[in-house]
Amino acid sequence: MNNNYHIAVLPGDGIGPETTRQVYKILNVIKKQFQINIVTTEHKIGGDAINSEGTPFPKSTLKYCEQSNAILFGAVGGPQWTHLKGSESPEQGALLALRKHFNLFANLRPIYLADELKELSPLNINMIPNGIDIIFVRELTGGIYFGQPKGRSGTGLNEYAFDTAVYHRFEIERIANIAFKLAQKRRKRVSSIDKANVLHTSMLWREVVSHLAKNYPDVELEHLYIDNASMQLINNPSKFDIILCPNLFGDILSDECAMISGSIGMLPSASINEHNFGLYEPAGGSAPDIAEKNIANPIAHILSIALLFRYSLKLDHIAIKIEKAVSQALMLGYRTIDIAKKHEKSISTNEMGDIIAALIKNEREK
């Protein structure tokens, strides 16, 4: 078994650097417990790179990412860079560029609501008796975000804008296969989202997914229109297992579901390619308003490194170890401010990182 791994660490902007520091605490414990050599090297990305090197995605950063087994990403963007557009902006010039360069076509976003946090959900707890345990499988490099042509034309009252939604059969097949295989390891149910009563891309999407489902007879498939799916997620989120989405629909629905779970600060994200190379990041943004105040929730970032171990390094036992420590911290009542109830004591970013690292370490020593 390979015991040597290289991880490119891109802390970025806002709360990215401080939550990254908490992940290092976890990695230090894991390295000692499992006797594996994990080499982490930090590189600049996003606004941080713009300030120091004049570009959101330096060539030196790309070079090291190409030499690594996976990328641990923080966050990019902030008010001082909002005037920058297109490839000069932190978001498009860095994050979208990484996705495109490494063909990270599959975005996996687990949405999990722990029993201890049910009261934080905007939904009545009677609507979620079985909690929420969903994985969004979102196609990430096709659809209307990337289709050409797009732009603006005309003048005055005749000015107009246009975007093009395009999906190829192979793009749908590869993302659907990931969804079905994940479902086989879970509750064996896939909900595929489209708008096949209107959009030609959705008609092809439904056709391809239905055909592939024949290869997975043990998995139940249902098709839902996007508008119906958005209602069902509010009405009965517990019914969902794997939600398979085109790019735009997945972007919208996963954020809706993130709020149902109580706090986006709890949610990790993985973007992977066909070779299991991936970029792992918290689902939330850079949150510049709370940066360096030691109040950001590092759990999403810590769970992201768990996903990195699971999907890119194929070390599922380590991923489970990290996830159990997070669950234990919550059961013991530890809360950052975003998941603390009114009048409930909260702990800092650094304290949460220390506690989760200690729980991993102590379990080994028992």
Curated annotation (Swiss-Prot):
One of its GO terms (molecular function) is magnesium ion binding. Its EC number is 1.1.1.85. It is found in: Cytoplasm. The record marks 145, 195 as: Important for catalysis. It holds the Pfam family Iso_dh. PROSITE patterns: IDH_IMDH (PS00470). It is an enzyme of class 1 (oxidoreductase). Substrate binds at residues 99, 109, 138, 227. The keyword rRNA-binding does not apply. NAD(+) binds at residues 78-91, 285-297. Its main location: cytoplasm. SUPFAM superfamilies: Isocitrate/Isopropylmalate dehydrogenase-like. It catalyses: (2R,3S)-3-isopropylmalate + NAD(+) = 4-methyl-2-oxopentanoate + CO2 + NADH. Keywords: Amino-acid biosynthesis, Branched-chain amino acid biosynthesis, Cytoplasm, Leucine biosynthesis, Magnesium, Manganese, Metal-binding, NAD, Oxidoreductase. InterPro entries: IsoCit/isopropylmalate_DH_CS, IsoPropMal-DH-like_dom, Isopropylmalate_DH. Pathway: Amino-acid biosynthesis; L-leucine biosynthesis; L-leucine from 3-methyl-2-oxobutanoate: step 3/4. GO terms for biological process: L-leucine biosynthetic process. Binds 1 Mg(2+) or Mn(2+) ion per subunit. Mg(2+) binds at residues 227, 251, 255. GO terms for cellular component: cytosol. HAMAP family: LeuB_type1. Catalyzes the oxidation of 3-carboxy-2-hydroxy-4-methylpentanoate (3-isopropylmalate) to 3-carboxy-4-methyl-2-oxopentanoate. The product decarboxylates to 4-methyl-2 oxopentanoate. Belongs to the isocitrate and isopropylmalate dehydrogenases family. LeuB type 1 subfamily. This is 3-isopropylmalate dehydrogenase. It comes from Blochmanniella pennsylvanica (strain BPEN).
